[in-house]
Amino acid sequence: TDQLPLDAIDVLFFCTAHGDTKKFMESHNVPEDLKIIDLSMDYRIKSDDHDFIYGLPELNRRATCTAKHVANPGCFATCIQLGLLPLAKNLMLTGDVSVNAITGSTGAGVKPGATSHFSWRNNNISIYKAFDHQHVPEIKQSLKQLQNSFDSEIDFIPYRGDFPRGIFAT
C-alpha cells in the first residue's frame, strides 16, 4: 500500500499481525468508500470507535453483505460459535459453557515457534492459553447478541493437535 494509492483499489485485505491494522488505519488517510476486510483481531469487538462488522455470516449475514469494513472472526471463535449460536438463538444457554477444542498446526499463527513444527507436534497434544484465550470475548459478544441474558462463563481449553488442518470442538 505504500506504492499504490488507496483510492486506486476497491478492496483492501489486512492479513497482518494483531495490532497492525489499527495502526495502519490511524496513520493513513483511508478513503471512505474503500472496502476493508481485516483478518486480525483488531476490530472484532464492537465499539463506537469503529464501524467494522463482525463477519460471521451465520450471525451477521445481512450486515456483512452491505458492510464497508468487515472484521473476520477468529478460527476457534468461528468453530465454537457455529455450535453455540443455535442454542443462544433459542435462549437455551442457561449456565457456564465448557469447550475443549483442538486445532491443527495451520492454526498456530504467523510466527513460527517450537510448538508449531511438526517434529514437536507429532504424537503430541498440548494445552495453551487455558481459560484465557483471545477468542473468548468475541464468542461472548456473539452469544449475547442472540441471547441478551447470557452472562455466564465460557471455560475454554484450546489444544494444539498433531494434524495439519482443521479444528474439532466439543
Q: What is each PLM-predicted segment?
A:
Residues 107-170:
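Charged docking surfaces used in two-component/phosphorelay signaling
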